Amino acid sequence: MTSSPIRILGIDPGLRRTGWGVLDIEGNRLMFVGCGSVETREQMALASRLLAIHEGLGRVLDEFRPAEAAIEQTFVNKDGVATLKLGQARGVAMLAPAMFGIVVAEYAPNQVKKTVVGAGHADKTQIQAMLKILLPKADPKSADAADALAIAITHAHHRGAAALRMKVAG
């Protein structure tokens, strides 16, 4: 009996640009499906930007129909206002798959880097180099889309443990 592929959506939340990446996993095989980003303009009102992120991710969810989703956890920086705005974008990005009945797993940035590159303090160029090896058909047009694919890869590797954590916590 062969198992059918499981489709995963990775999300890299951001107010300016929210990256998304979709891949299928079958056993230990990763297959690139698509990636991109939802962009907003700084001149837009905050509520309009959040709505644009929600609608953009809704279109991605409609088109690709993932079974699982993952998002990067927010890091707190020195700029409290920027951190709050990122948190709002992250909340909207988590809501979109939840409205489709999809549980959203969360991963720390250093866990994503360690999973994809092997080092928790890897930089963006190292992540992009590994993406070319792991997903040769992927051609992300932005760092945010590349990060979203890295988040999806992380979930593919840790999904069993993530499901168990959610079950225990729930």
Swiss-Prot record:
The keyword Hydrolase applies. Keywords: Cytoplasm, DNA damage, DNA recombination, DNA repair, DNA-binding, Endonuclease, Hydrolase, Magnesium, Metal-binding, Nuclease. It is found in: Cytoplasm. Gene3D superfamilies: Ribonuclease H-like superfamily/Ribonuclease H. Its EC number is 3.1.21.10. PROSITE patterns: RUVC. Its cofactor is Mg(2+). SUPFAM superfamilies: Ribonuclease H-like (SSF53098). One of its GO terms (biological process) is DNA recombination. Mg(2+) 1 binds at residues 12, 144. PANTHER family: CROSSOVER JUNCTION ENDODEOXYRIBONUCLEASE RUVC. Belongs to the RuvC family. NCBIfam families: ruvC (TIGR00228). This is Crossover junction endodeoxyribonuclease RuvC. It comes from Nitrobacter hamburgensis (strain DSM 10229 / NCIMB 13809 / X14).
